[in-house]
């Protein structure tokens, strides 16, 4: 399996882990939770399979340190309902929350208020960069888009037509789309963007949008989708039209995995979900225990949390027919606690 991660970030993580190991004999107790110390993972569309490996990684780190965890959020794709679930989490007074904000700006005030009241917030997979969140864990969305653009050109040539589906308002999805378009314009000007429609992770909307794009552009060569829900509908439309369109998307679901195995989807770029959850917990724990570090900066004067980590790249995997079996969620969950 191919993995992609920023060298600088990878090195810093390795150094951090090495230092933690070296000092474990003398400071082991510092990496343990107090009885009842709880961390929450909050998401939208809580039934989506993407969260399963993330929460497993979150729990693995927590269990190693004697901490308690809760999986929370809303089953709906609704920013108001997610914020309401976040507010309910705050009432429980957890030590920290690993948050996937559906939209960036609506979460600024709730995040800042949570931190002011002593609950540390780390974001993952999507961000609220204007908030005071302590850390952000994600795959490099620009690297994903660049990889996708180069793969599309490698398969269809430097001259052709492509389209994108999108999910406006979610930071990681926005970046996956805009970065690919910008890269194509800068490096492959003969690749023409002929369709761009918002489908908002809705497979039915994606089916209709893709059918419309195909009808208007029968010579379409490739389709890039920033998430897996829309890919489910898009591939159905392409198959129904019997069109020869190369499909690439980010993330993966059991449905799109089967289409990859069947050759209907060329490949998927999937964030390293387990590492996302594991590092998400670690950064939330460290944010809640800032006394564990005395860095060489002005944190004592400025008053900010010294555990600030603006960005950690958890890397991404390329899923193809050859390695698709390794991403079978049912196989992964065998023997694991799903709660």
Predicted regions and their residues:
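Beta-alpha junction/loop-to-helix N-cap segments that form part of ligand/metal-binding clefts
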Residues: 76-129, 135-140, 228-235
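Hydrophobic alpha-helical
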Residues: 96-116, 180, 199-259
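Short, solvent-exposed amphipathic alpha-helices that sit
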Residues: 50-65, 144-148, 172-191, 205, ...
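Hinge/cleft segment of the Venus flytrap/periplasmic-binding protein
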Residues: 28-37, 172, 184-187, 283-339
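Flexible loop/hinge segments that line or gate small-molecule binding clefts
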Residues: 68, 105-143, 151-154, 161, ...
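Hydrophobic alpha-helical segments within soluble ligand-binding/sensing domains
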Residues: 33, 82, 137-162, 175, ...
């Amino acid at each position: 399996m191919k993995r992609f991660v920023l060298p600088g970030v990878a090195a810093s993580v390795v150094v951090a882990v090495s230092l933690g190991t070296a000092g474990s004999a003398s400071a082991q107790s510092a990496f343990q939770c107090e009885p009842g110390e709880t961390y929450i993972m909050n998401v939208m569309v809580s039934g989506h399979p993407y969260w399963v490996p993330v929460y497993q990684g979150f729990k693995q780190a927590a269990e190693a340190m004697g901490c308690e965890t809760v999986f929370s959020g809303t089953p709906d794709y609704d920013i108001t309902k997610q914020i309401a679930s976040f507010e309910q989490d705050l009432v429980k007074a957890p030590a920290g929350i690993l948050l996937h904000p559906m939209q960036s700006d609506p979460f600024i005030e709730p995040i800042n208020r949570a931190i002011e009241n002593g609950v540390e917030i780390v974001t993952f997979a999507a961000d609220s960069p204007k908030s005071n969140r302590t850390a952000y864990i994600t795959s490099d969305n620009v690297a994903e888009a660049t990889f996708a653009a180069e793969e599309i050109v490698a398969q269809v040539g430097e001259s052709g037509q492509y389209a994108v589906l999108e999910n406006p308002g979610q930071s990681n999805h926005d970046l996956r789309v805009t970065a690919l378009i910008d890269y194509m314009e800068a490096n492959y000007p003969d690749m023409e963007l002929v369709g761009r429609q918002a489908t908002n992770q809705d497979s039915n909307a994606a089916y209709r949008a893709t059918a419309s794009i195909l009808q208007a552009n029968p010579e379409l060569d490739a389709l890039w989708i920033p998430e897996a829900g829309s890919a489910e509908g898009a591939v159905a439309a392409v198959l129904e039209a019997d069109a020869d369109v190369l499909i690439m998307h980010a993330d993966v679901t059991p449905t799109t995995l089967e289409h990859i195995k069947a050759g209907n989807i060329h490949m998927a770029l999937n964030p390293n979900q387990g590492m996302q959850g594991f590092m998400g917990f670690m950064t939330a724990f460290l944010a809640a225990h800032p006394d564990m570090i005395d860095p060489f900066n002005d944190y004592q004067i400025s008053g900010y949390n010294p555990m600030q980590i603006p960005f950690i790249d958890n890397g991404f995997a390329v899923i193809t027919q050859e390695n698709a079996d390794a991403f079978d969620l049912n196989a992964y969950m065998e023997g694991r606690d799903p709660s």
